[in-house]
């Protein structure tokens, strides 16, 4: 968006408060905002021209208590949208696919697993945007600098949002080709003695952490643990699937994760007091 428009603000749950930039915004400014479920709980007039929900996975149950309530709050992002607005949704998420059948804004689905009659999808190594009138090649996955199928899905969602916000295909292609991993999201750090180090500390729920494991293409020593959001760790541990050789655990959840891993037959586990000790044990 920043390549195509003069006045763009990136704000919200990424770390820059919306209110901190509000006085700098002009009539023609564009705001790109990451909105958390916590923020959506209390919206009144918030109305995005283009919204998106990338997936619905178990998270923040320490606040929302049930998945049903978490889903209800996430879906509030379309509360004030009209028929001229757009909502981008993940077709492969059953909850979102059904949600898209009964909302007011125009729905644009994305999928990395199948071609869509309309929407944006992965066809071989090519990301295609199919509108009512045409098929538009966006980018080949080999041109991207970010790893993993989930990042292909992120590119699809971002490209669809930008397109329906009025950004040209040329600008979209240029931006997605130049984009590198954001800090703490499968971020390459360095390679030492044949070991590549990645920082995926933004993977703060099991689904996000699974995406990080799936993006690795060599045997992995994994540091995990942290604040307890009352999530289940079974699916995350099952995703190790022979790829994770050792699990180094820290934080509030280390004993809980250790118990879950051992119950599922994974026993190559080291418990540490903090991140520094964990890195020293690699």
PLM features: residue spans?
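Walker A (P-loop) phosphate-binding motif
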Residues: 1-12
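C-terminal helical cap/extension that packs against the catalytic core
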Residues: 234-282
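Short internal beta-strands
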Residues: 87-91, 223-224, 243-252
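Flexible active-site lid/hinge loop adjacent to a nucleotide/diphosphate
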Residues: 24-116, 121-123, 128, 135, ...
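Residue-level signal for inorganic ion chemistry
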Residues: 13, 34, 54, 70, ...
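Nucleotide phosphate-binding/pyrophosphate-handling subdomain across enzymes
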Residues: 141-245
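Beta-strand->loop->alpha-helix junctions that form or flank phosphate-binding loops
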Residues: 11, 104-122, 173-177, 187, ...
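Short, structured coil segments at secondary-structure junctions
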Residues: 47, 102-104, 216, 243, ...
